[in-house]
Amino acid sequence: MKVIFSLKRIRRNIAILLTALMLFASGATAASAAVHENTRRPVIDAKSAALYSVTTDEMLYAKNPDQRVEPWSTTKLMTALVVAETMDLNQEVTVSKKAASMGGSTMNLVAGEKVTVRQLMYGLLLESGNDAAYALGQADGDGSIKTFAAKMNARAKKLGCKGTHFVNPNGLKAKNHYTTAADYVKIARAALANKTVFKIAGTKVYHMDATNKSHARTIETHLDLIEKKGSGVVAGKTGYWEDDDCSVALMYDKKGLKMILVQFGANMETRAKDGAKLLKFGTEKIVTKKATNPKKSVGNVRVKYGARTLVKTYAKGTVLTYPKDGSADSISVKENYKDVVKAPLKSGDKVGTLEVYCDGKKVGSTPLVVHENIEKGWFLSRFYISNRATIAIGVILVLLALIIGFLVRRRKNRKAEETLAPKKAEVAAEKTSDVPENVDDHPEDRYL
């Protein structure tokens, strides 16, 4: 009995030990998974950074987003935005001595040189010209940099920036010249949404014609990532003060996903590497898929004055992006048609917009178009009645007219018969009264 008891106890102890080992292993696995999840968040050298998804309207990554930092030459994105919104690109500017004397990165402007606003904008955003920035600030500020800085601050306030203040247009070190990563996401987004700024900031090389004071220039971008094929970086601006105090503000646009990335207090050697790391992190957090099928009808639109007044509509095509932890079931679409769609229409004509929502939040839109030509219809088409319906209505009206005519005639005939019936009865009665009565009073006469 003692042996049996010992064996049972040994088995029980083994079971307890195995259970403990399993629990420990599962705990270790969970801890490992937690560590893995944490390591997925990029570790970067920049003191402050933010990665924002324009497509899904969400902040994907932030490191000290509200910390005050010096923007350095990324300031020039705001300078470019203000200039693009208030000046004519063809306007000629005469470079002042003060502008020509600017140090640091320049496009080598000469005092008295006559250049256009467009040429200065390329020098500003590609060559990061401090001289170009100063010349633009003077031109747009009626000769006063203080006036131009006030315009920059007013524009920042309009964008909702609460931790930003500009003193100059080039970003050179100055007291009370600062921003935050959270604010600069708004500034970069607005600047790169401007067609002029986007085109210039997305240019790799610009060939500038000779001026009255200088030979032709070749201006190249300082943005490293835009040079790399397949990087998805389409435009932006770098900033530099020292090797361990650099900045960048750029736009990524690839496969339907658009993001804004800003870094401040970054290391010169790792700025581009960290930028690529953050962009990769952003693409992994977002799912990209087709929200609509351009070949499948999404609805119908009523067409006024058309030979056909109810026409199928198709989405021109859009790619939807939404958070990876979201669900495709949360996607919905809403058709918005023009108040009045009039014929004639050609295949491909826009008749409305299809809005795409994810969890109730608008995340995209695409034009709604027709895939056929619609000619003008007949008179009733002004009441949204098609030619085919007009024919059908005509046939129905003719049939109704025939039926009504038949019924009217039959009713008239019946009334006529009802009117004539008494007369016919009188005539019949009169005829009956004229016939002699056949009274056989003398039956014997039949044998005479």
Language-model-detected regions and their locations in the chain:
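Short, Lys/Arg-rich N-terminal segment immediately upstream of the first membrane anchor
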Residues: 2-10, 39, 62, 379-385
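Active-site-adjacent loops and short helices of periplasmic peptidoglycan-processing enzymes
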Residues: 5-6, 31-200, 254
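Internal alpha-helical transmembrane segments of multi-pass membrane proteins, especially GPCRs
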Residues: 15-19, 82, 202
